[in-house]
Amino acid sequence: MIKVGINGFGRIGRMVFRAAVKNFGNDIQIVGINDLLDAEYLAYMLKYDSVHGRFEGEVAVEDGALIVNGNKIRLTAEMDPANLKWNEVDADVVVESTGFFLTDETARKHIQAGAKKVIMSAPSKDSTPMFVYGVNHTSYAGQDIISNASCTTNCLAPIAKVLNDKFGIVKGLMTTVHAATATQKTVDGPSKKDWRGGRGILENIIPSSTGAAKAVGKVLPVLNGKLTGMAFRVPTSDVSVVDLTVVLEKAATMAEINAAMKEASEGELKGILGYTEDAVVSTDFRGCANTSIYDSKAGISLDSNFAKVVSWYDNEWGYSNKVCEMARVIAAK
């Protein structure tokens, strides 16, 4: 059993917890949660969720600890990860999901506190290696601190890999139409660095930057410098969609591209890349554990070398499931 600690019980921290209990119960045991909020409120936020519904299990607080389905989970409220004493709960892996400790230097405080490995649930801000499960996880070589990249990179990388493997990508532009996240404002408010990002999400489509496309070059070096992209933040609570437009080296019809995606979804990328031929919309993918679901009916091509492909992702649930998958990978080495 892999013992996992979670630092930061926000959207991703809670979804990683739920995924571990629901889909990885035979492999992963959550042994500790560090968050500055009090125990009763952490239990409440785990139990009830506006997007994903009620937690399927028993949740209680006892003597300052969280009790979930009879299992005791240590709760702490430390600002500094160096004080977390992960050795006391034998943490094999710590999921760093506060969004604050995204360099080797800062995340290493978990190692100093007794954790064996650390997964950042966001792109690293330094040279910490990034992994996308299903795309480059087999190249993991025992590093004690890794990044699970972003939810958007986890959606984009599988389809980019299939396109490049089968047809070759000369260059490409990505747009993600992205659901709202916790950093956004419900009404207009101050945002010094990103003025547009300070506008209210309830009534705006907000153009934003994203490093997700460039990050694909880190998990697939063959595509380094060939992709870039942007985001539109939209007034939905969950599920986002990647629109990737590429110039291909080899000529390909949309039927051939669809066939390549379907083959990959049933083969090497099964469980990571999904495939649909249905007339779907975003809420149809809420709760889907695949990180990228290719929409065969949404893609278009201008000619045999210029095509647009579309892939959906539950930016909370799909991503969090792959954090758990990567925890299994790094705990095994």
From Swiss-Prot:
D-glyceraldehyde 3-phosphate binds at S150, C151, T152, T181, T210, G211, R233. It comes from the Bacteria. PANTHER family: GLYCERALDEHYDE 3-PHOSPHATE DEHYDROGENASE (PTHR10836), GLYCERALDEHYDE-3-PHOSPHATE DEHYDROGENASE-RELATED (PTHR10836:SF76). Catalyzes the oxidative phosphorylation of glyceraldehyde 3-phosphate (G3P) to 1,3-bisphosphoglycerate (BPG) using the cofactor NAD. The first reaction step involves the formation of a hemiacetal intermediate between G3P and a cysteine residue, and this hemiacetal intermediate is then oxidized to a thioester, with concomitant reduction of NAD to NADH. The reduced NADH is then exchanged with the second NAD, and the thioester is attacked by a nucleophilic inorganic phosphate to produce BPG. InterPro entries: GlycerAld/Erythrose_P_DH (IPR020831), GlycerAld_3-P_DH_AS (IPR020830), GlycerAld_3-P_DH_cat (IPR020829), GlycerAld_3-P_DH_NAD(P)-bd (IPR020828), Glyceraldehyde-3-P_DH_1 (IPR006424), NAD(P)-bd_dom_sf (IPR036291). CDD domains: GAPDH_I_C, GAPDH_I_N. It is found in: Cytoplasm. This is Glyceraldehyde-3-phosphate dehydrogenase. NAD(+) binds at R11, I12, D35, M79, S121, N315. Belongs to the glyceraldehyde-3-phosphate dehydrogenase family. GO terms for molecular function: glyceraldehyde-3-phosphate dehydrogenase (NAD+) (phosphorylating) activity; NAD binding; NADP binding. GO terms for cellular component: cytoplasm. Pathway: Carbohydrate degradation; glycolysis; pyruvate from D-glyceraldehyde 3-phosphate: step 1/5. Homotetramer. Its EC number is 1.2.1.12. Keywords: Cytoplasm, Glycolysis, NAD, Nucleotide-binding, Oxidoreductase. One of its GO terms (biological process) is glucose metabolic process. It catalyses: D-glyceraldehyde 3-phosphate + phosphate + NAD(+) = (2R)-3-phospho-glyceroyl phosphate + NADH + H(+). The record marks H178 as: Activates thiol group during catalysis. The active site is at C151 (nucleophile).
